[in-house]
Every structure is written in structure tokens, then in C-alpha cells.
Swiss-Prot record:
It catalyses: 7-phospho-2-dehydro-3-deoxy-D-arabino-heptonate = 3-dehydroquinate + phosphate. Its EC number is 4.2.3.4. This is 3-dehydroquinate synthase. Its cofactor is NAD(+); Co(2+); Zn(2+). Keywords: Amino-acid biosynthesis, Aromatic amino acid biosynthesis, Cobalt, Cytoplasm, Lyase, Metal-binding, NAD, Nucleotide-binding, Zinc. It comes from the Archaea. It is found in: Cytoplasm. Zn(2+) binds at E168, H227, H243. Pathway: Metabolic intermediate biosynthesis; chorismate biosynthesis; chorismate from D-erythrose 4-phosphate and phosphoenolpyruvate: step 2/7.
Length: 335
């Protein structure tokens, strides 16, 4: 797991010393500013860090926010040999990665993910993105110099954020038997905070796949399990439905497609999601959801591409007939 560090904030000075950055800027949001920024800055004081604070929320993951950050970096004299640290959840890590990859054609990037979702998914693997008429329509692939995964952040997370990230862990469980068996031993969502073994297993699954296919030309697409439907649900809700909750619903639909095509037991997915209190019913009209799925960067030649589970530990990436998708959406709406 090169570049992925499991530790506490006291490791930050050594991480930065190895880079010798010209300037250090911490990008965070209004919520994290009150909760964690002061402590992080204390550990970075020898590097004289500056900060950029943006509003909290998925709807701010757009070009306006990126433009604001670019302008602030220019004002600060930020250079290619300077370090941008993204301190926050998936929105912040996505924005920080995109800004770092585009500003002066690439600067140093470090990520300190503060949510379960970011620690197991958004901050891992080098994907960056902003929303533009759809989820992550504009983005790059750009690897950070480091990702610091600190369990202390999870201890202060509200339950809604634990659940938001747990959906991605369940996704890894469908793709990997070892993660699936570990999840089955959990009795409540908050157990994940103390189960660093499950977090490490989830990260390892993603890294193993990403190392084979960084730029998502082939195998990496399996990590989009639940996301073709999930992104459509987020879009229809105007991002009022959190990413993990949308992915949870997407996992159910795509599991049902697997059931139709391959006899996959979708009940296993529904059972785990229900045990943790994650949503399994689609709240929107199936046809509306289907149309939203067509505005998707994973589409091939205008065709909807789905990650279809065949069995626990195995999934196919394939075009799926719209009639089958509608059938699965209907079943999930009435589940």
C-alpha cells in the first residue's frame, strides 16, 4: 500500500519533510474548519501552512468552487513544487485532486480523508472529479503523494456519515469474499470505527484493482458496482440524497440485474444493507431513473453499462438491455 498511511496526525510532519514543499495550503470546508482544522494546522506549524475554506456539500463540487481555489492559490504564490492538502470527505478529496492535477499542470497533492466514505473509496486510487450536468463529468486521474488514514476522524462522525461510507464497504464485500465474510461478523454500523481490519481490507481490494488499471480502461470499472444507478439517483435528487445512500439503492438494482441474468442471490445484498439500516428501495419512477442513467461517463457508444454481480467475489462489466434494467428498477422500487 505505497502512499497509503494508516496512522494519526502526528505523522504529518515527517510526510511533509520528505517532500520539502515550497508552500503548504490546506483545503477544507466550513464544517471541518470548526472540527479539525486547528489541530491539523498545529501539526503543520513548522511549514507555515495557509488555508482555503469552501462551503460544505456536494452541490459545491463544481467549476465555480474550483475557479475560486485556483484564484486563491495564485494570490498565495502557490507553485508546482507546493503541496495542496485536501482535509475532508469525498467532496474535498475530489476537488483537491482536480485542482492539484490542473493548476500549473500538476502540483504536489496530499489527502487527509475525514469520513469513512473518503477513507475507503474517494481518496483511494487517483480519481478526481467535479460535477457538470452530471456526477463527476469533468475529472482527471492524479495520484497523491500520500493519503493519511486516521481512525480518530471516524470516532466523531455522525451515524449518517458512517452509513454513507458503509455502503461502499458493502460494495467491496460483493466484489471480494474476504470483505464479505468480515462484514457479516458486524452487528451494528458503528462497529466499523473499531474494525480497522475491514477498512484495510476494503482499501486493499481497491488498490489491487487500481494497480492493474489506473485509468479505468478495463478491470477498474468493476469498482463502479452500484454507481451507474447510484449516480442517476443522486442527479435526480439534485444531490440531496447522499452518495452512499444512492449507491446502496444502486447495489440492490444491480444485484437484481445479476439475479435476472445469472441467478445471483440479490437477497444477500438486501439482507446486509437492511441490517445496517441502509436504503434498499428506489424512491423515483423507474423510467425517470433509466433516462438519468444514460448521462453517465461509463456509457459505451450510448449504451448503458452496468457492473453485474455473478456471485460474491465476481462481477461482469456489460451492456444491459433497457427492459432488464427497468424490470430491476421496478423490483427495487417495490421491494
Amino acid at each position: 500500500m505505497e502512499g497509503i498511511i494508516f496512522g494519526d496526525l502526528s505523522t504529518l510532519p515527517d510526510l511533509l519533510s520528505s517532500l520539502s514543499p515550497y508552500k503548504v495550503v490546506v483545503l477544507t470546508n466550513t464544517t471541518l474548519k470548526e472540527l479539525w482544522l486547528e489541530e491539523v494546522l498545529t501539526w503543520l506549524k513548522e511549514f507555515k501552512p495557509q488555508t482555503i475554506v469552501v462551503p460544505d456539500g456536494e452541490k459545491y463540487k463544481d467549476l465555480d468552487t474550483v475557479r475560486y481555489i485556483w484564484e486563491k492559490l495564485l494570490e498565495m504564490g502557490f507553485t508546482r513544487r507546493s503541496l495542496l492538502i485536501g482535509l475532508g470527505g469525498g467532496v474535498i478529496t475530489d476537488i483537491a485532486g482536480f485542482v492539484a492535477s490542473t493548476y500549473m499542470r500538476g502540483t504536489y497533492l496530499g489527502l487527509v480523508p475525514t469520513t469513512l466514505l473518503a477513507q475507503v473509496d474517494a481518496a483511494i486510487g487517483g480519481k478526481t472529479g467535479i460535477n457538470f450536468y452530471g456526477k463527476n463529468i469533468i475529472g482527471t486521474f492524479y495520484l497523491p503523494k500520500f493519503v493519511l488514514i486516521c481512525r480518530d476522524f471516524l470516532k466523531t462522525l455522525p451515524m449518517v456519515e458512517i452509513l454513507n461510507g458503509l455502503a461502499e464497504v458493502v460494495k467491496y464485500g460483493i466484489l471480494d469474499k474476504e470483505v464479505y465474510n468480515a462484514i457479516k461478523t458486524m452487528n451494528s454500523p458503528r462497529e466499523i470505527v473499531e474494525r480497522e481490519d475491514i477498512i484495510k481490507k476494503s482499501v486493499a481490494v481497491k488498490l489491487r484493482i487500481v494497480e492493474e488499471d489506473l485509468k479505468e480502461n478495463g478491470k477498474r470499472r468493476v469498482l463502479n458496482l452500484g454507481h451507474t444507478v447510484g449516480h442517476a439517483i443522486e442527479k435526480i435528487s439534485d444531490y440531496k440524497i447522499k452518495h452512499g445512500f444512492a449507491v446502496s439503492m444502486g447495489l440492490v438494482v444491480e444485484a437484481k440485474i445479476g439475479e435476472i441474468l445469472y441467478g445471483f442471490d440479490s437477497g444477500k445484498v438486501v439482507e446486509i444493507l437492511t441490517k445496517f439500516g441502509l436504503p434498499v428501495k428506489i424512491p423515483f419512477d423507474p423510467y425517470t431513473t433509466l433516462q438519468a442513467m444514460k448521462i453517465d461517463k461509463k456509457a459505451w457508444y450510448g449504451k448503458i453499462v452496468i457492473v453485474v454481480p455473478v456471485e460474491i467475489g465476481k462481477a461482469n462489466i456489460e451492456e444491459v438491455d433497457e427492459k432488464i434494467i427497468l424490470q430491476a428498477l421496478e423490483e427495487a422500487k417495490n421491494a
